Curated annotation (Swiss-Prot):
A Gene Ontology biological process term: DNA-templated transcription
Gene of this entry: rpoB
Protein known as: DNA-directed RNA polymerase subunit beta
GO molecular function, one term: DNA binding
PROSITE patterns: RNA_POL_BETA (PS01166)
Top-level EC class: transferase
Family: Belongs to the RNA polymerase beta chain family.
Record key words, sorted: DNA-directed RNA polymerase, Nucleotidyltransferase, Transcription, Transferase
A Pfam family it matches: RNA_pol_Rpb2_2
Classification via PANTHER family: DNA-DIRECTED RNA POLYMERASE I SUBUNIT 2 (PTHR20856)
Organism of derivation: Shewanella sp. (strain W3-18-1)
Coiled-coil ranges from the UniProt annotation: none
Length: 1343
């Protein structure tokens, strides 16, 4: 493999055995592609905004004399960029402008004669835009729209599993689900009649809907039944014989062939052998006794030819009297319905008998009554209602997906078709459910991923936009019908408010629009790849059963079987598998390699869950020879959702990668294959809660996906084009672009601005640091700067800690963690948290609030950190209770005391008119002020601090832009100088020229002269562009802010808090091994090895066997080897060994392992590159052991040998306190530990006096409410068990809800009198009132 200059800085040793056929696709594409489809102009009009507009327009007036047509739309440019939106607290959106055409028709002239056409561009609200990283900024906060897994539109057949009826009979049902519109259900009842429901309302006999579709009884019977033909001959009947129909029946008469010999005697069961004999003898007719027809149903009406009287009506039972009547009337041929209990049930025939309607109108009225109970039906209303239910494109849409699923399920050859239902569709569904009831077909599996599809951002936004448009449509139609249209323009008809409101509601408050989880890069990516079954149109937690939540065979390679939350949402919220993507219909697909005649090709095809069922698919870990032919004869594979063994020649596809089945979070766990799934689930979930540490450190033992994740997450800065680094500082990187990647006539400079110390959604710190140096070559895709939790472009969520598995004086009992003081001293787990505190000055009824340093009754010392405007200065160190922003609020006139009146008379000032309402630092918070923002309403005078901040921002903008301009100008000038050099000018001549003259020289070569003129033109453009950009920036900075009504000023103060690790913080490994720090132990007391190196963390070995996450032990061994190799390299460098020896050792390390795919050609590295690589490997060689394809035990032992460590992975340890050796050797190595965002500082809380609940008068609960500790029934039992009566009494009275007792006790404590008198708890009064509310009077006897 060829490595770029920056990749050679540190290469991860990969133990993967399988070739990488396909790179993991871009991780955020599910979000970005979906939204792109929504906003991009689609000429076909099948999706996005275009589809929404075309579905609603044209809007015709009621009279038909005018209509409003849609022409095209365009999205404008957003006013503020993403960062400005976050600071100002506004939505990152672009205005939508739509070109509409209003057409007026001439009433007098012939139909369709156009009288007037007016075209105009109309503003239709703002559409929120997606940032480059797949998020939305709504009101200043980053949000993610989670994709939804919902039941695909189409037709589904199911049964109730025998749960509806007490007999346990299985009742079948069919449901047609449209994309929008009414649901149509067919269901059998226990008596085998077929019923229909519309929108889950009252059920009606299913034949009513057929009558409403203009089918007569005769036609209905012909649709669903075959006929049996009889001829009447004297005393017998002759039946037309279809031998197959007799199978399984018991002969009620002798069956004879044409010659009259008996084939089946009466009372015998007819078998397949008998049928074959009948077919051989070509018997076409059978004589049957007259009684045979009795009880069968007539297939048509039989009418007396003379009188016209109906002798036997269709679907009525035939009796001997009916036969006699028919004979008399001279009717010789009779048809009956072919009904057979086994496989041709009389369902429709039975249903027709229940059906009270006889014609279309009655059926329509019946449907109308069911849909609109209590309304008087009229013919027109009933027809219109039925028409609108399933046959109107405005009200009903199966959608493209729905039509495809519908047609495929009912074996209709074409995938395309109308979005509304037809008569034939409804009949086909009824036929199919009868087919299933007859036992010829299977019901569907609704949890199969072929029946559930993904609805992503774009589709949901489009639906919401359509909702807004439909609201507008009603208003437009009314306006078109009113008033004089000659005066009106399209703009006067359209009100953009409903559209904006619908879109805003979706992005702001939909269940699927979620506050982004921004703890670390992994949590961001996982959140964007989350697939939820909840939300509008989805399931609810309460209704979701076990089957929906369970892992389904079709999840393979599509949804991760591991990563899902614990708790009530388990299985309802899933994560996309690493290689999965959605197809054009919204179904999940996963890639497979094609296999032809047992030979694996590199051709990759994506298959959906439905397609996959047809093929035989082998796993990725099968043995293959050098030619790609499968070695084994019998191969483990999957077919139709089952695991089986098949011959190599039968295999059609093979998995692309062993990591294919799991999500990115799960594939970050090394040795995942050795962990129990429950613990792997916790490991995958807890990595998302890791807080970015002060100094990120790459994991020594990783899986090789760390780089992909860091790059795709968008937290690192990635080079867009190749070149070399021209300039680097903490906030900017400048890359001079390679000649061959330049666009003609451009400066060839790329500038990357870095994000510094900003706050994330979870209050962690986002900060980017350059990881490149001036002069270094860069290729496209190289990482130029690290973000939070990344190290040299690798995801780095935690720290590599030296671990020993041993008990230590009970300090690691029950998953507690003992850590060394050194970890705290070296700031290994120190994290920075940034809090945003806001102070809002409002206009109140009594006057406006004021931000000032002049605060009543506050001493000088408390104001020491404020400037003259009353706002804290940047860099101030503050603690709980300090004033950050001084604010006074006017208060109403109160009754003055005589002393105050005297003071007022002497000094004549109204000092007491305002009260202090300053913003203070919350208790228990201590930190440094890193930024202050002041937002002032338009028209309100800016204070001194606001002006200062503005000037500072303008100066910064000018500096940034002028530096950018200088860099770009230099780029243009250097290209011009090169041209002049090539045209015969000497270097001294060029150097002596003033800058402005370089571009105005005259050259003989015409082509070069043209190029120079182009450069001069470009220089002018740059200048103009600079002025324009600066003016826009200045205007944005100085303009007033759009604040909420009644708000005059907002001051936001950002406070950076440094949190060191301490007892009570939660830590975890990557294998679900979590625990709480119990003690920080002095370094000298920690166990140490023979070299005197103490361990960092002591874990309890009992946490491993019962949890079955052995992956952590293998990680510790491998970590020890990786660190040991790093130590060896360090020793070599310190001893200044020959470079060849270092090169040889590094080469040996990278070549270790059986059949590993990675090839690192250390020999081709220059001496400098080897030296830099060695320097970067001093802390340990990073290792990749991919999930299901990782390092074997043998390879771990080889690594330990290379590192000069015992292959057992165990060392002698000595007790730090006594110096004695422990009696057994201890497993010591390196494990990657994470500090989770469950910090004791955020949880620790104690209540003194505080607020009480209104009804029970008990203290509130929780830190946010400054609540008390709950003393529940179990705690009461404990005190009862100990007989601690007085303690229990005060817990239940004065410390809780004895209102008088607690007030009295407070006074007593203040007076120094430590007495208490418990009274009646308020909760007892509540109980009395509850009982009285039931009408039972209870009174207490006061004795």
């Amino acid at each position: 493999m060829v490595y770029s200059y920056s990749e050679k800085k540190r290469i991860r040793k990969d133990f993967g055995k399988r070739p990488q056929v396909l790179d993991i696709p871009y991780l955020l594409s599910i979000q970005l592609d979906s939204f792109k489809k929504f906003t991009d102009q689609d000429p076909t009009g099948e999706r996005g905004l275009e589809a929404a507009f075309r579905s609603v327009f044209p809007i015709k007036s009621f009279s038909g004399n005018s209509e409003l047509q849609y022409v095209s739309y365009k999205l404008g440019e957003p006013v503020f960029d993403v960062k400005e939106c976050q600071i100002r607290g506004v939505t990152y959106s672009a205005p939508l402008r739509v070109k509409l055409r209003m057409v007026l028709y001439d009433r007098e002239a012939a139909a369709g004669t156009v009288k007037d056409i007016k075209e105009q561009e109309v503003y239709m609200g703002d559409i929120p835009l997606m940032t480059d990283n797949g998020t939305f900024v709504i009101n200043g906060t980053e949000r993610v729209i989670v994709s939804q897994l919902h039941r695909s539109p189409g037709v589904f057949f199911d049964h109730d599993r025998g749960k509806t009826h007490s007999s346990g009979k299985v009742l079948y049902n069919a449901r047609i689900i449209p994309y929008r519109g009414s649901w149509l259900d067919f269901e059998f009842d226990p008596k085998d009649a077929l019923f229909v429901r519309i929108d889950r309302r009252r059920k009606l006999p299913a034949t009513i809907i057929l009558r409403a579709l203009e089918y007569s009884t005769q036609e209905i019977l012909d649709l669903f039944f075959e006929r049996v033909e009889f001829k009447i001959k004297k005393d017998t009947l002759v039946m037309a014989l279809v031998p197959e129909r007799l199978r399984g029946e018991t002969a009620s008469y002798d069956i004879k062939d044409a010659e009259g010999s008996v084939l089946v005697e009466a009372g015998r069961r007819i078998t397949a052998r008998h049928i074959r004999q009948l077919e051989k003898t070509n018997t076409t007719e059978l004589e049957v006794p007259v009684e045979y027809i009795v009880g069968k149903y007539a297939a048509q009406d039989y009418i007396d030819p003379d009188t016209g009287e109906v002798l036997v009506s269709a679907n009525s039972e035939i009796s001997l009297e009916d036969l006699a009547k028919l004979s008399l009337a001279g009717i010789k041929d009779i048809s009956t319905l072919y009904i057979n209990e086994l496989d041709h049930g009389a369902y429709i025939s039975d249903t027709l008998r229940i059906d009270s309607t006889t014609n279309r109108l009655e059926a329509l009225v019946e449907i109308y009554r069911m849909m609109r109970p209590g309304e008087p039906p009229t013919k027109d209303a009933a027809e219109a209602l039925f028409q609108n239910l399933f046959f109107s494109e405005e009200r009903y849409d199966l959608s493209k997906v729905g039509r495809m699923k519908f047609n495929r399920r009912l074996s209709i050859p074409d995938d395309e078709g109308s979005g509304v239902l037809s008569k034939e569709d409804i009949v086909a569904v009824m036929k199919n459910i009868i087919h299933i009831r007859n036992g010829f077909d299977e019901v569907d599996d609704i949890d199969h991923l072929g029946n559930r599809r993904i609805r992503s951002v774009g589709e949901m936004a489009e639906n919401q936009f359509r909702v807004g448009l439909v609201r507008v449509e009603r208003a437009v139609r009314e306006r078109l019908s009113l008033g004089d249209l000659n005066e009106l323009m399209p703009q006067d008809l359209i009100n953009a408010k409903p559209i904006s409101a619908a879109v805003k509601e979706f992005f702001g408050s939909s269940q699927l629009s979620q506050f982004m989880d921004q703890n670390n890069p992994l949590s961001e990516v996982t959140h964007k790849r989350r697939i939820s079954a909840l939300g509008p149109g989805g399931l609810t937690r309460e209704r979701a059963g076990f089957e929906v939540r369970d892992v389904h065979p079709t999840h393979y390679g599509r949804l991760c079987p591991i990563e899902t939350p614990e708790g009530p949402n388990i299985g309802l919220i899933n994560s996309l598998a690493s290689f999965a993507r959605t197809n054009s219909y919204g179904f999940l697909e996963t890639p497979y390699r094609k296999v032809i005649d047992g030979v694996i090709t590199d051709e990759v095809e994506y298959l959906s869950a439905i397609e996959e069922g047809r093929y035989v698919i082998a796993q990725a870990n099968i043995e293959v020879d050098a030619n790609g032919r499968m070695v084994e004869e019998q191969i483990a594979c999957r077919h139709k959702g089952e695991s089986t063994f098949m011959r190599a020649s039968d295999i059609q596809y093979m998995d692309v990668s062993p990591q294919q089945i799991i999500s990115v979070a799960a594939s970050l766990i090394p040795f995942l294959e050795h962990d129990d799934a429950n613990r792997a689930l916790m490991g995958a979930n807890m990595q998302r809660q890791a807080v970015p540490t002060l100094r990120s450190e790459k994991p020594l033992v990783g899986t090789g996906i760390e780089r992909t994740l860091a790059v795709d997450s968008g937290v690192v800065v990635v080079a867009k084009r190749g070149g070399y680094i021209d300039y680097v500082d903490a906030s900017r990187i400048v890359v001079k672009v390679n000649e061959d990647e330049l666009r003609p006539g451009e400066a060839g400079i790329d500038i990357y601005n870095l994000t510094k110390y900003t706050r994330s959604n979870q209050n962690t710190c986002i900060n980017q640091r350059p990881c490149c140096a001036v002069g270094e070559p860069v290729v496209r895709g190289d990482v130029l700067a690290d973000g939070p939790s990344t190290d040299l472009g690798d995801l780095a969520l935690g720290q590599n800690m030296r671990i020993a598995f041993m008990p230590w004086n009970g300090y690691n009992f029950e998953d507690s963690i003992l850590i060394s003081e050194r970890v705290a001293q070296e700031d290994r787990f120190t994290t920075i948290h940034i809090q945003e505190l806001s102070c809002i000055a409002r206009d109140t009824k009594l006057g406006s609030e004021e931000i000032t340093a002049d605060i009543p009754n506050v001493g000088e010392s408390a104001l020491s950190k404020l400037d003259e405007s009353g706002i804290v200065y940047i860099g101030a160190e503050v603690k709980g209770g300090d004033i950050l922003v001084g604010k006074v609020t006017p208060k109403g006139e109160t009754q003055l005391t005589p002393e105050e009146k005297l003071l007022r008379a002497i000094f004549g000032e109204k000092a007491s008119d305002v009260k202090d309402s300053s913003l203070r630092v919350p208790n228990s918070v201590k930190g440094t002020i890193i930024d202050v923002q002041v937002f002032t309403r338009d028209g309100v005078e800016k204070d001194k601090r606001a002006v200062e901040i503005e000037e500072m921002h303008i100066a910064q903008a000018r500096k940034d832009l002028s530096e950018e301009f200088k860099i770009l100008e230099e780029g243009v000038l250097s290209r011009a100088r090169n041209l002049l050099l090539g045209a015969g000018f000497t270097e001294t001549q060029i150097a002596a020229m003033p800058r402005k003259d370089v571009l105005v020289q005259v050259i003989d070569d015409e082509a070069k002269q043209t190029e120079l003129e182009q450069l001069a033109e470009q220089h002018e453009e740059l200048k103009a562009d600079f002025d324009k950009k600066f003016e826009i920036k200045r205007r944005k900075i100085t303009q007033g802010d759009d604040l909420a009504p009644g708000v005059l000023k907002i001051v936001k103060v950002y406070l950076a808090v440094k949190r060191t690790i301490q007892p009570g913080d939660k830590m975890a490994g990557r294998h679900g091994n979590k625990g709480v720090i119990s003690k920080i132990c002095p370094i000298e007391d920690m166990p140490y090895d023979e070299q005197g190196n103490p361990v960092d963390i002591v874990l309890n070995p009992l946490g491993v066997p019962s949890r079955m996450n052995i992956g952590q032990v293998l990680e510790v061994h491998m970590g020890a080897a990786a660190k040991g190799i790093g130590n060896k390299i360090t020793a070599m460098l310190e001893e200044q060994r020959e470079l060849a020896e270092v090169r040889g050792y590094i080469k040996q390390v990278y070549e270790l392992g059986d059949e590993v795919q990675q090839r690192v050609d250390i020999d081709s590295f220059t001496d400098d590159e080897v030296m830099r690589l060695a320097q970067n490997l001093k802390g340990g060689i990073p290792i990749a052991t991919p999930a299901f394809d990782g390092a074997k035990e043998k390879e771990i032992k080889q690594m330990l040998e290379l590192a000069g460590l015992p292959t057992s992975g165990q060392l002698k340890l000595y007790d730090g306190r006594t110096g004695n050796e422990f009696e057994r050797q201890v497993t010591v190595g390196y494990m990657y530990m994470l500090k989770l965002n469950h910090l004791v500082d955020d949880k620790m809380h104690a209540r003194s006096t505080g607020s009480y609940s209104l009804v029970t008068q008990q203290p509130l609960g929780g830190k946010a409410q400054f609540g008390g500790q709950r003393f529940g029934e179990m705690e009461v039992w404990a005190l009862e068990a100990y007989g601690a009566a007085y303690t229990l009494q005060e817990m239940l009275t004065v410390k809780s809800d004895d209102v008088n007792g607690r007030t009295q006790m407070y006074k007593n404590i203040v007076d120094g009198n430590h007495q208490m008198q418990p009274g009646m708890p308020e909760s007892f009064n509540v109980l009395l009132k509850e009982i009285r509310s039931l009408g039972i009077n209870i009174e207490l006897d006061q004795e």
